[in-house]
From Swiss-Prot:
Phosphorylates both NADH and NAD(+), with a twofold preference for NADH. Anti-oxidant factor and key source of the cellular reductant NADPH. Signal peptide: none annotated. It is an enzyme of class 2 (transferase). GO terms for biological process: cellular response to oxidative stress; iron-sulfur cluster assembly; NAD metabolic process; NADP biosynthetic process. This is NADH kinase POS5, mitochondrial. The gene is POS5. It comes from Saccharomyces cerevisiae (strain ATCC 204508 / S288c) (Baker's yeast).
Length: 414
Protein backbone atom coordinates (compact mmCIF):
# COMPACT_ATOMS: atom_id res chain seq x y z
CA UNK A 1 0.00 0.00 0.00
CA UNK A 2 1.40 3.38 -0.95
CA UNK A 3 1.12 6.71 0.83
CA UNK A 4 -1.30 8.39 -1.56
CA UNK A 5 -3.63 5.41 -1.73
CA UNK A 6 -6.74 5.83 0.42
CA UNK A 7 -7.77 2.75 2.33
CA UNK A 8 -11.38 2.08 3.16
CA UNK A 9 -12.36 4.14 0.11
CA UNK A 10 -15.95 3.43 -0.87
CA UNK A 11 -16.82 2.68 -4.45
CA UNK A 12 -19.55 4.63 -6.17
CA UNK A 13 -22.95 3.35 -5.15
CA UNK A 14 -26.38 4.09 -6.44
CA UNK A 15 -29.24 3.54 -4.04
CA UNK A 16 -32.43 1.97 -5.22
CA UNK A 17 -35.60 3.06 -3.47
CA UNK A 18 -38.73 1.00 -3.90
CA UNK A 19 -42.01 2.83 -4.29
CA UNK A 20 -44.00 -0.36 -3.91
CA UNK A 21 -46.01 -0.99 -0.78
CA UNK A 22 -45.63 -4.15 1.27
CA UNK A 23 -48.75 -5.73 -0.23
CA UNK A 24 -47.79 -5.46 -3.88
CA UNK A 25 -44.08 -6.08 -4.28
CA UNK A 26 -43.77 -6.74 -8.00
CA UNK A 27 -40.32 -8.09 -8.82
CA UNK A 28 -39.48 -10.42 -11.67
CA UNK A 29 -37.89 -13.38 -9.95
CA UNK A 30 -36.72 -14.99 -13.18
CA UNK A 31 -36.59 -18.43 -11.55
CA UNK A 32 -39.17 -20.94 -10.45
CA UNK A 33 -36.96 -21.81 -7.47
CA UNK A 34 -37.11 -18.32 -5.92
CA UNK A 35 -39.93 -16.50 -4.21
CA UNK A 36 -39.60 -12.82 -3.34
CA UNK A 37 -41.61 -11.45 -0.42
CA UNK A 38 -42.00 -7.99 1.12
CA UNK A 39 -39.69 -7.33 4.04
CA UNK A 40 -42.61 -5.82 5.96
CA UNK A 41 -43.79 -9.38 6.62
CA UNK A 42 -40.88 -9.85 9.04
CA UNK A 43 -40.75 -8.85 12.67
CA UNK A 44 -38.84 -5.76 13.77
CA UNK A 45 -35.13 -6.01 14.40
CA UNK A 46 -33.84 -7.53 17.61
CA UNK A 47 -30.74 -6.08 19.27
CA UNK A 48 -27.81 -8.17 20.38
CA UNK A 49 -25.94 -7.76 23.65
CA UNK A 50 -22.19 -7.34 23.97
CA UNK A 51 -20.31 -8.58 27.01
CA UNK A 52 -16.68 -7.81 27.85
CA UNK A 53 -14.99 -11.10 28.79
CA UNK A 54 -11.93 -11.06 31.06
CA UNK A 55 -8.49 -10.83 29.46
CA UNK A 56 -9.83 -9.86 26.04
CA UNK A 57 -9.81 -6.72 23.91
CA UNK A 58 -12.97 -7.90 22.15
CA UNK A 59 -16.59 -8.25 23.24
CA UNK A 60 -18.71 -11.37 23.09
CA UNK A 61 -21.78 -11.23 20.82
CA UNK A 62 -24.82 -12.60 22.67
CA UNK A 63 -28.28 -13.02 21.11
CA UNK A 64 -30.99 -12.68 23.75
CA UNK A 65 -33.56 -13.50 21.07
CA UNK A 66 -32.75 -15.95 18.26
CA UNK A 67 -31.14 -14.39 15.20
CA UNK A 68 -33.75 -14.28 12.43
CA UNK A 69 -33.27 -11.45 9.94
CA UNK A 70 -29.98 -11.25 8.04
CA UNK A 71 -29.43 -8.42 5.57
CA UNK A 72 -26.80 -9.24 2.93
CA UNK A 73 -25.16 -6.63 0.71
CA UNK A 74 -22.45 -7.10 -1.87
CA UNK A 75 -20.05 -5.26 -4.10
CA UNK A 76 -22.05 -4.38 -7.23
CA UNK A 77 -21.54 -5.78 -10.71
CA UNK A 78 -18.86 -8.34 -9.90
CA UNK A 79 -19.32 -12.04 -10.76
CA UNK A 80 -17.32 -13.22 -7.72
CA UNK A 81 -19.55 -11.48 -5.17
CA UNK A 82 -22.67 -12.54 -7.05
CA UNK A 83 -21.62 -16.20 -6.93
CA UNK A 84 -20.61 -15.88 -3.28
CA UNK A 85 -23.96 -14.35 -2.35
CA UNK A 86 -25.90 -17.17 -4.02
CA UNK A 87 -23.73 -19.75 -2.26
CA UNK A 88 -24.12 -18.05 1.12
CA UNK A 89 -27.90 -17.68 0.78
CA UNK A 90 -28.23 -21.32 -0.27
CA UNK A 91 -26.27 -22.36 2.82
CA UNK A 92 -28.55 -20.29 5.07
CA UNK A 93 -31.72 -21.70 3.52
CA UNK A 94 -30.52 -25.29 3.80
CA UNK A 95 -28.84 -25.18 7.22
CA UNK A 96 -30.83 -22.45 8.99
CA UNK A 97 -34.43 -22.48 7.68
CA UNK A 98 -35.47 -20.19 10.54
CA UNK A 99 -33.22 -17.40 9.21
CA UNK A 100 -34.77 -14.85 6.83
CA UNK A 101 -32.57 -13.42 4.07
CA UNK A 102 -32.99 -9.72 3.20
CA UNK A 103 -31.49 -8.06 0.12
CA UNK A 104 -31.94 -4.86 -1.85
CA UNK A 105 -34.63 -4.93 -4.59
CA UNK A 106 -32.11 -4.68 -7.43
CA UNK A 107 -30.02 -7.47 -5.91
CA UNK A 108 -33.08 -9.69 -5.58
CA UNK A 109 -33.75 -9.39 -9.29
CA UNK A 110 -30.11 -9.85 -10.18
CA UNK A 111 -29.39 -13.04 -8.24
CA UNK A 112 -32.79 -14.73 -8.46
CA UNK A 113 -31.87 -16.10 -11.88
CA UNK A 114 -28.81 -17.84 -10.42
CA UNK A 115 -30.74 -20.31 -8.27
CA UNK A 116 -30.93 -23.26 -10.66
CA UNK A 117 -32.24 -25.97 -8.35
CA UNK A 118 -34.49 -26.42 -5.30
CA UNK A 119 -33.19 -26.94 -1.78
CA UNK A 120 -31.53 -30.32 -1.37
CA UNK A 121 -33.14 -31.08 1.99
CA UNK A 122 -36.59 -29.79 0.98
CA UNK A 123 -37.24 -29.80 -2.81
CA UNK A 124 -40.75 -28.40 -2.33
CA UNK A 125 -39.55 -25.28 -0.51
CA UNK A 126 -38.29 -22.40 -2.69
CA UNK A 127 -35.54 -19.96 -1.87
CA UNK A 128 -37.24 -16.99 -0.21
CA UNK A 129 -35.76 -13.50 -0.47
CA UNK A 130 -37.19 -10.54 1.43
CA UNK A 131 -36.83 -7.04 0.07
CA UNK A 132 -38.47 -3.63 0.05
CA UNK A 133 -37.79 0.06 0.73
CA UNK A 134 -34.51 0.89 2.40
CA UNK A 135 -36.00 2.11 5.68
CA UNK A 136 -38.07 -1.07 6.03
CA UNK A 137 -34.89 -3.11 5.60
CA UNK A 138 -33.14 -1.05 8.27
CA UNK A 139 -36.01 -1.54 10.72
CA UNK A 140 -35.89 -5.33 10.40
CA UNK A 141 -32.20 -6.18 10.24
CA UNK A 142 -30.62 -8.19 13.06
CA UNK A 143 -27.27 -8.84 11.38
CA UNK A 144 -25.51 -7.11 8.47
CA UNK A 145 -23.40 -9.35 6.21
CA UNK A 146 -21.14 -7.75 3.59
CA UNK A 147 -19.50 -9.47 0.63
CA UNK A 148 -16.83 -7.27 -0.90
CA UNK A 149 -14.21 -4.83 0.30
CA UNK A 150 -14.07 -1.95 2.73
CA UNK A 151 -16.27 0.18 0.48
CA UNK A 152 -19.02 -2.42 0.73
CA UNK A 153 -18.93 -2.18 4.51
CA UNK A 154 -19.10 1.62 4.44
CA UNK A 155 -22.06 1.47 2.08
CA UNK A 156 -23.89 -1.08 4.19
CA UNK A 157 -23.29 0.82 7.42
CA UNK A 158 -24.34 4.13 5.82
CA UNK A 159 -27.89 2.77 5.48
CA UNK A 160 -28.07 2.86 9.28
CA UNK A 161 -26.75 6.42 9.36
CA UNK A 162 -28.92 7.84 12.14
CA UNK A 163 -30.01 4.59 13.78
CA UNK A 164 -28.39 1.80 15.76
CA UNK A 165 -26.11 -0.29 13.55
CA UNK A 166 -26.56 -4.08 13.75
CA UNK A 167 -23.51 -6.32 14.20
CA UNK A 168 -21.42 -6.52 11.03
CA UNK A 169 -20.03 -9.75 9.58
CA UNK A 170 -17.67 -8.93 6.70
CA UNK A 171 -16.16 -11.30 4.14
CA UNK A 172 -13.27 -10.05 2.03
CA UNK A 173 -14.10 -10.25 -1.68
CA UNK A 174 -12.88 -6.85 -2.83
CA UNK A 175 -9.65 -5.00 -3.53
CA UNK A 176 -9.24 -3.89 0.09
CA UNK A 177 -9.79 -5.89 3.22
CA UNK A 178 -8.69 -3.75 6.14
CA UNK A 179 -12.14 -4.02 7.69
CA UNK A 180 -12.89 -7.54 6.41
CA UNK A 181 -11.02 -10.17 8.44
CA UNK A 182 -12.69 -13.29 7.02
CA UNK A 183 -12.09 -15.14 3.79
CA UNK A 184 -15.32 -16.28 2.19
CA UNK A 185 -14.16 -19.90 2.40
CA UNK A 186 -14.80 -19.64 6.15
CA UNK A 187 -18.43 -18.52 5.84
CA UNK A 188 -20.02 -21.72 7.17
CA UNK A 189 -17.86 -21.89 10.28
CA UNK A 190 -18.04 -18.17 11.00
CA UNK A 191 -21.81 -17.89 10.65
CA UNK A 192 -22.27 -20.88 12.96
CA UNK A 193 -20.22 -19.04 15.60
CA UNK A 194 -22.28 -15.88 15.13
CA UNK A 195 -25.72 -17.50 15.32
CA UNK A 196 -24.73 -19.60 18.35
CA UNK A 197 -23.43 -16.55 20.31
CA UNK A 198 -19.82 -17.72 20.21
CA UNK A 199 -18.40 -14.88 18.10
CA UNK A 200 -16.43 -11.89 19.36
CA UNK A 201 -16.64 -8.34 18.09
CA UNK A 202 -14.39 -5.32 17.83
CA UNK A 203 -16.11 -2.07 18.74
CA UNK A 204 -15.54 0.81 16.32
CA UNK A 205 -16.71 4.34 17.12
CA UNK A 206 -18.65 6.67 14.83
CA UNK A 207 -18.56 10.43 14.46
CA UNK A 208 -21.68 12.55 14.40
CA UNK A 209 -21.71 15.58 12.10
CA UNK A 210 -24.20 18.44 12.38
CA UNK A 211 -24.28 20.69 9.30
CA UNK A 212 -25.74 24.13 9.99
CA UNK A 213 -26.36 26.64 7.21
CA UNK A 214 -25.93 30.27 8.19
CA UNK A 215 -29.57 31.10 7.43
CA UNK A 216 -31.02 28.16 9.40
CA UNK A 217 -31.52 27.43 13.10
CA UNK A 218 -31.56 23.65 12.66
CA UNK A 219 -28.98 21.22 11.39
CA UNK A 220 -28.68 18.12 9.22
CA UNK A 221 -27.20 15.14 11.07
CA UNK A 222 -25.06 12.41 9.51
CA UNK A 223 -22.76 9.74 10.94
CA UNK A 224 -19.32 8.60 9.82
CA UNK A 225 -17.53 5.30 10.37
CA UNK A 226 -14.35 6.55 8.68
CA UNK A 227 -14.06 10.28 8.27
CA UNK A 228 -15.61 13.67 7.68
CA UNK A 229 -13.64 16.07 5.54
CA UNK A 230 -13.99 19.56 4.16
CA UNK A 231 -12.16 20.29 0.93
CA UNK A 232 -12.08 22.83 -1.87
CA UNK A 233 -13.11 20.35 -4.57
CA UNK A 234 -12.39 21.69 -8.05
CA UNK A 235 -12.19 25.29 -6.88
CA UNK A 236 -8.85 27.09 -7.51
CA UNK A 237 -9.18 28.85 -4.13
CA UNK A 238 -7.93 27.46 -0.84
CA UNK A 239 -10.45 27.09 1.97
CA UNK A 240 -10.44 29.40 4.99
CA UNK A 241 -11.63 27.54 8.06
CA UNK A 242 -12.06 28.76 11.65
CA UNK A 243 -11.63 25.82 14.02
CA UNK A 244 -12.91 25.70 17.61
CA UNK A 245 -12.45 22.88 20.14
CA UNK A 246 -14.74 22.75 23.19
CA UNK A 247 -15.69 26.37 22.59
CA UNK A 248 -12.08 27.58 22.47
CA UNK A 249 -10.69 29.07 19.27
CA UNK A 250 -7.87 26.86 17.96
CA UNK A 251 -6.81 28.38 14.66
CA UNK A 252 -7.80 29.76 11.30
CA UNK A 253 -6.30 27.65 8.57
CA UNK A 254 -5.86 28.27 4.88
CA UNK A 255 -5.58 24.89 3.21
CA UNK A 256 -7.06 22.48 0.71
CA UNK A 257 -9.20 21.30 3.61
CA UNK A 258 -9.24 19.35 6.85
CA UNK A 259 -10.16 15.76 7.71
CA UNK A 260 -11.78 14.59 10.95
CA UNK A 261 -11.43 10.85 11.36
CA UNK A 262 -12.25 8.02 13.72
CA UNK A 263 -9.46 5.59 14.66
CA UNK A 264 -10.99 3.26 12.06
CA UNK A 265 -10.63 6.01 9.46
CA UNK A 266 -7.04 6.78 10.47
CA UNK A 267 -5.87 4.41 7.71
CA UNK A 268 -7.98 6.14 5.04
CA UNK A 269 -7.90 9.74 3.83
CA UNK A 270 -6.26 10.96 7.04
CA UNK A 271 -3.26 8.68 6.52
CA UNK A 272 -2.79 9.92 2.95
CA UNK A 273 -2.74 13.49 4.31
CA UNK A 274 -0.04 12.67 6.87
CA UNK A 275 -2.13 11.69 9.89
CA UNK A 276 -1.21 9.07 12.46
CA UNK A 277 -2.33 5.45 12.48
CA UNK A 278 -4.52 4.90 15.54
CA UNK A 279 -5.86 1.63 16.92
CA UNK A 280 -9.67 1.38 16.89
CA UNK A 281 -9.45 0.61 20.62
CA UNK A 282 -8.18 4.14 21.34
CA UNK A 283 -11.02 6.61 22.08
CA UNK A 284 -9.99 9.57 19.94
CA UNK A 285 -10.86 11.95 17.13
CA UNK A 286 -8.17 12.73 14.56
CA UNK A 287 -7.85 16.19 13.01
CA UNK A 288 -5.60 16.19 9.94
CA UNK A 289 -5.00 19.26 7.75
CA UNK A 290 -5.00 18.67 4.00
CA UNK A 291 -2.11 20.53 2.35
CA UNK A 292 -2.13 23.53 4.73
CA UNK A 293 -0.36 26.73 3.71
CA UNK A 294 1.30 26.85 7.12
CA UNK A 295 3.76 24.05 7.84
CA UNK A 296 3.19 24.49 11.59
CA UNK A 297 -0.36 23.10 11.41
CA UNK A 298 0.37 19.50 12.34
CA UNK A 299 -2.12 16.62 12.69
CA UNK A 300 -3.82 16.39 16.08
CA UNK A 301 -5.23 13.48 18.08
CA UNK A 302 -8.03 14.79 20.31
CA UNK A 303 -10.01 13.15 23.13
CA UNK A 304 -13.14 11.38 21.92
CA UNK A 305 -15.22 13.73 24.11
CA UNK A 306 -14.11 16.78 22.09
CA UNK A 307 -16.68 19.11 20.55
CA UNK A 308 -15.26 20.42 17.28
CA UNK A 309 -16.82 23.36 15.43
CA UNK A 310 -15.56 24.49 12.03
CA UNK A 311 -16.87 27.66 10.42
CA UNK A 312 -16.33 28.53 6.77
CA UNK A 313 -14.48 31.84 6.58
CA UNK A 314 -13.29 34.10 3.78
CA UNK A 315 -10.06 35.91 3.02
CA UNK A 316 -10.08 39.47 4.37
CA UNK A 317 -13.82 39.09 5.05
CA UNK A 318 -14.46 39.11 1.31
CA UNK A 319 -16.26 36.29 -0.39
CA UNK A 320 -14.15 34.95 -3.25
CA UNK A 321 -15.73 33.88 -6.48
CA UNK A 322 -16.95 30.28 -6.39
CA UNK A 323 -15.90 29.87 -2.75
CA UNK A 324 -17.92 26.71 -2.22
CA UNK A 325 -16.46 24.20 0.25
CA UNK A 326 -17.26 20.54 -0.28
CA UNK A 327 -18.29 18.27 2.60
CA UNK A 328 -17.90 14.50 2.38
CA UNK A 329 -18.92 11.90 4.97
CA UNK A 330 -17.35 8.48 4.45
CA UNK A 331 -16.68 9.48 0.86
CA UNK A 332 -20.31 10.39 0.17
CA UNK A 333 -20.79 14.03 -0.95
CA UNK A 334 -23.09 16.12 1.23
CA UNK A 335 -24.41 19.65 0.83
CA UNK A 336 -21.93 22.31 -0.30
CA UNK A 337 -20.92 24.87 2.32
CA UNK A 338 -20.50 28.60 1.84
CA UNK A 339 -19.07 31.42 3.93
CA UNK A 340 -20.75 31.48 7.34
CA UNK A 341 -21.88 27.85 7.29
CA UNK A 342 -20.69 25.56 10.09
CA UNK A 343 -20.24 21.92 10.97
CA UNK A 344 -20.22 20.49 14.50
CA UNK A 345 -18.45 17.16 14.96
CA UNK A 346 -18.67 15.03 18.10
CA UNK A 347 -18.44 11.39 19.07
CA UNK A 348 -21.69 9.53 18.52
CA UNK A 349 -22.23 8.99 22.25
CA UNK A 350 -22.14 12.74 22.84
CA UNK A 351 -19.81 15.27 24.43
CA UNK A 352 -19.50 17.49 27.48
CA UNK A 353 -21.03 20.82 26.55
CA UNK A 354 -19.53 24.02 27.87
CA UNK A 355 -21.81 27.05 28.24
CA UNK A 356 -22.48 28.56 24.84
CA UNK A 357 -21.24 25.56 22.84
CA UNK A 358 -24.42 23.55 22.48
CA UNK A 359 -25.25 21.93 19.17
CA UNK A 360 -27.66 23.81 16.90
CA UNK A 361 -30.30 21.14 17.49
CA UNK A 362 -32.07 20.24 20.72
CA UNK A 363 -31.69 16.50 20.33
CA UNK A 364 -28.88 16.47 22.89
CA UNK A 365 -28.47 18.92 25.73
CA UNK A 366 -26.10 19.17 28.67
CA UNK A 367 -28.82 18.10 31.11
CA UNK A 368 -29.66 15.05 29.04
CA UNK A 369 -25.99 14.10 29.01
CA UNK A 370 -25.52 14.56 32.76
CA UNK A 371 -28.78 12.91 33.80
CA UNK A 372 -28.65 9.94 31.45
CA UNK A 373 -28.21 6.71 33.43
CA UNK A 374 -29.08 4.20 30.73
CA UNK A 375 -26.06 3.44 28.54
CA UNK A 376 -26.58 3.96 24.84
CA UNK A 377 -25.25 1.35 22.44
CA UNK A 378 -23.25 3.33 19.97
CA UNK A 379 -20.70 2.70 17.30
CA UNK A 380 -20.31 -0.42 15.19
CA UNK A 381 -19.60 -3.94 16.42
CA UNK A 382 -17.66 -5.86 13.77
CA UNK A 383 -17.24 -9.61 14.10
CA UNK A 384 -13.50 -10.24 14.58
CA UNK A 385 -11.33 -13.18 13.65
CA UNK A 386 -8.62 -12.80 16.28
CA UNK A 387 -7.58 -10.40 19.03
CA UNK A 388 -4.97 -8.89 16.70
CA UNK A 389 -6.80 -8.32 13.41
CA UNK A 390 -5.71 -4.67 13.43
CA UNK A 391 -2.01 -5.51 13.74
CA UNK A 392 -2.35 -8.03 10.93
CA UNK A 393 -4.01 -5.36 8.82
CA UNK A 394 -1.31 -2.71 9.16
CA UNK A 395 1.39 -5.32 8.50
CA UNK A 396 -0.16 -7.16 5.56
CA UNK A 397 -2.18 -4.39 3.91
CA UNK A 398 -0.23 -1.26 4.80
CA UNK A 399 3.17 -2.92 4.65
CA UNK A 400 4.03 -1.24 7.95
CA UNK A 401 7.77 -0.41 8.23
CA UNK A 402 8.51 -2.44 5.11
CA UNK A 403 11.99 -2.38 3.65
CA UNK A 404 12.65 -0.43 0.46
CA UNK A 405 15.11 -3.03 -0.78
CA UNK A 406 14.43 -4.10 -4.35
CA UNK A 407 13.74 -7.75 -5.03
CA UNK A 408 15.61 -9.48 -7.82
CA UNK A 409 13.60 -9.33 -11.03
CA UNK A 410 13.31 -12.60 -12.88
CA UNK A 411 14.28 -12.71 -16.53
CA UNK A 412 13.33 -15.05 -19.33
CA UNK A 413 16.68 -16.79 -18.92
CA UNK A 414 16.13 -17.64 -15.22
Amino acid sequence: MFVRVKLNKPVKWYRFYSTLDSHSLKLQSGSKFVKIKPVNNLRSSSSADFVSPPNSKLQSLIWQNPLQNVYITKKPWTPSTREAMVEFITHLHESYPEVNVIVQPDVAEEISQDFKSPLENDPNRPHILYTGPEQDIVNRTDLLVTLGGDGTILHGVSMFGNTQVPPVLAFALGTLGFLSPFDFKEHKKVFQEVISSRAKCLHRTRLECHLKKKDSNSSIVTHAMNDIFLHRGNSPHLTNLDIFIDGEFLTRTTADGVALATPTGSTAYSLSAGGSIVSPLVPAILMTPICPRSLSFRPLILPHSSHIRIKIGSKLNQKPVNSVVKLSVDGIPQQDLDVGDEIYVINEVGTIYIDGTQLPTTRKTENDFNNSKKPKRSGIYCVAKTENDWIRGINELLGFNSSFRLTKRQTDND
